[in-house]
Amino acid sequence: GGSSNSAAASTSTAASSTAASAAGDATAAANDPKVTLVYAEVNPLDTIVGQTATHFKEKVEELTGGSVVIDVQASGVLGSENDVLDAILGGSTSIDMSRISAFALTSYGCNKSKLLSIPFTFENRAHFWNFANSDLAPEFLNEPQELGLPVRGIFYGEEGFRHFFTVKPVSGIADFKGLKLRV
């Protein structure tokens, strides 16, 4: 079968809860100068997004001299993306940040995020990263806060591109007419 190189990017953002206590309880912070933040990830650590979480943890701890510790909870042990976001929205202080896919954010009214999940939005990885590093990208990262959600997008991640395998060649969106898709 054929496959399309102009596939849809599966994008995600790391979302940090602005409602969660940044330094935890004030008394605890005074007694322990370290701040531990819980990072929820639905995928295992050996995936690209799991590796991104690990890299984020290492960089934060390095750049803060260890005063901020990131506790990565992977493999969905804290729930699905929607479970995690619901917990954050409900005021949970047990989760401080999570990687949330652009598609998952659409369930919470983030309509700009839908654009990031449409097939053929990006021609290739370079095209996606040109967008992610552009002046337009913050509009998407800031959308949850603009809608009043207590989360902040802090970076883009790329989970890879979707590839479509078919009996007939696919070179553009029109070629999908009549095809059944399974994801």
Give the predicted meaning of each segment.
Residues 24, 46-71, 135:
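Short, polar/charged alpha-helical segment
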Residues 30-32, 49-52, 79-87, 94-97:
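Conserved N-terminal glycine/acidic-rich loop preference
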Residues 70-75, 100:
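Surface-exposed patches in mature extracellular/periplasmic domains of secreted proteins
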Residues 38-54, 75-79:
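Extracytoplasmic "Venus flytrap"
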Residues 1-36:
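Short, low-complexity disordered leader/linker segments with a strong preference
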Residues 58-61, 91-94, 101-183:
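Contiguous mixed-secondary-structure segments that line small-molecule binding/active-site clefts
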Residues 73-86, 170-171, 183:
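Short helix-initiation/N-cap motifs at beta->coil->alpha
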Residues 36, 67-71, 180:
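Residues at or immediately flanking beta-strands
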